[in-house]
Amino acid sequence: MDHPFFRHPSLLACGLLLPLCSAQAQTDEETGTIVVTATRTAQTVDDTLAPVTVLTRADIERLRPTSVPDLLAGQPGIDVSSNGAFGKNTSISLRGTSAGQTLVLIDGIRAGSATSGTTALEYLPVDQIERIEIVRGPRASLYGADALGGVIQIFTRPGTGSGWQASVTGGSFGTWSGRAATRGEIGNTRYHLTVSGLASDGYDIQENGAPTSFGATTVEPDDDRYRNTALNFGVSHHLDNGVEFGAQALRAEGRTDYDGFPNRTDFVEQVISAHVGGELTETWYSRLTVGESRDETDNLANGSDFSTFDTRRQSASWQNDLSLPGEQLLTVGLDGWRDRVDSTTDFSEDRRDNWAVFAQDQIDLGRHQLILGLRRDDNEAFGTHTTGNATWGVALRENLRATASFGTAFKAPTFNDLYYPDEGFYAGNPDLDPETAQNMEVGLQYDLAQFILNVNVFRNDIDDLIVFDAAKSTVSNIDQARIDGVESGLTYRSEEWRAHAALTALDTENRTTGAELPRRAELTGRIELDRIMGAYRLGTTLLAQDGRYDDAANTVSLAGYGRLDLRAEWLLMPQWALQVRIENVLDKDYQTAATYEQPGRAGYLTLSYRTP
């Protein structure tokens, strides 16, 4: 019998456009919300065995966050540390892992810097996003390196349909932003275009000065500005024989100011991709995707050039989904990418290649479901690495499901780790091995009509952590870490009310030193509550975290905090809406990174329009 992926029209349609068309949040009674990141195939959230959080365009317009990190903060398993608001350096921790141990995809393409190993989500305009899927737990058996804590996939392409959207926002810190978007269909051709811009005078993120590497303090009593402009365009065409092909591009560029030396960064974040896919037979779907991501930062000190780091990653992926007898969906494919680095820093190597083969079998046994995955990567820097994953789910009742899984993962050393030139105080180590991890977890999902409860308990053991070895003035694989955690979520929906609560509890330990891992709060909670009253909507968000340490030695502590936001929306007419929101209503002083102040009380007003 064919797998449900091929029998269900909406799943197959989404698969034909994977990963771009999957940006649409399909939410009807029959299928529920469709996700693709957990298995690289389209499935409903109800059918997904992995812990998944989906944030749609409707969520973004309801919350109106100023940035992607602000949208992600406090979601199940996520901890955000930032050097202030408005484009300042931000670290996203998923399940207690570091920012470099979380894989970020943009429209199916690997994003981020090959030198730092992280993705600058603070530079990605939230106005360009249609959907975010957060998959928690290792996914190296599907995606390869860096998916220790999980995968965050950001989709920028709108779903089906035609129309215009526009919005303008103004508020505190001299902040203005605007967005205009259109999408449509001409015959079998779809297109979309979104432009956005944001400008903020900002605030002084380090009122007491910025410490330098020379032990001094740089005091710059000025506001730290931010500018960002972005463009996203795409087109796709569907042939009568079922084959679909298309291309799209996203580019964001701007500048951010801060205190210190250097004190300004000009940036470019760019993702370009093209794809072709379709059903070769009734039981065989194939897709080829090629793309390039770019991460460029030009650092300036008082207006003079200081350093440049430009990463370009060309990638290709060929994926095949085969429906097998016995309710099985077999996915096999090839992935490959090449990292190139162009920098004012003289790295000993400026490129490396990675090739991989992967396979996954999804088996539906009625009450029981089983997913088995295996992948082998061959990287010219550190050789071959094999990862695997096994997940089992069982329906205890019609609305109650239990899951258990075990998976392995690894993080590739960065160009800074491997190839940084010897400058006396530091040099890269070309003999590094990847960091490796083993994760086990159990979960429970209870779906009771309007209420959905999710609980997951996990343990992640990480070996060969790459840390600075002062005795050798380089980095080495010398540390081990253990992360135990519990994450829970409760959602309620009705015609008039929407409520969501998330709580994450972490116990982290560097098993070499006995210290807690830095910038990981033991408890993180987020509560959202919205009331719909005809043409009006009222809402509030409470984000709370307890204290944490800022450094690996656990000598600098950060206090816990609670931040309360309020929002109200008035539907002026079917096409027009007015929204006001107040962030940090109680004007709390708090930091998520030592010496860097988070913004105080702030207010914003948004006027939006959409065609009916």
Predicted regions and their residues:
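Periplasmic-side early beta-strands and strand-to-turn transitions of outer-membrane beta-barrels
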Residues: A140-S141, Q153, G161-S172, W176, ...
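Repeated loop/turn-to-beta-strand initiation elements of outer-membrane beta-barrel proteins
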Residues: S162, N188-Y191, N241-F245, L280-L288, ...
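N-terminal periplasmic "start-of-domain" segments of outer-membrane beta-barrel proteins
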Residues: E30-L63, S91, A99
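Extracytoplasmic beta-strand/coil segments of soluble accessory domains associated
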Residues: P69, A73-I109, E130
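Outer-membrane beta-barrel signature, preferentially recognizing the C-terminal barrel domain
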Residues: N263-E279, F309-Q314, E380-A381, A395, ...
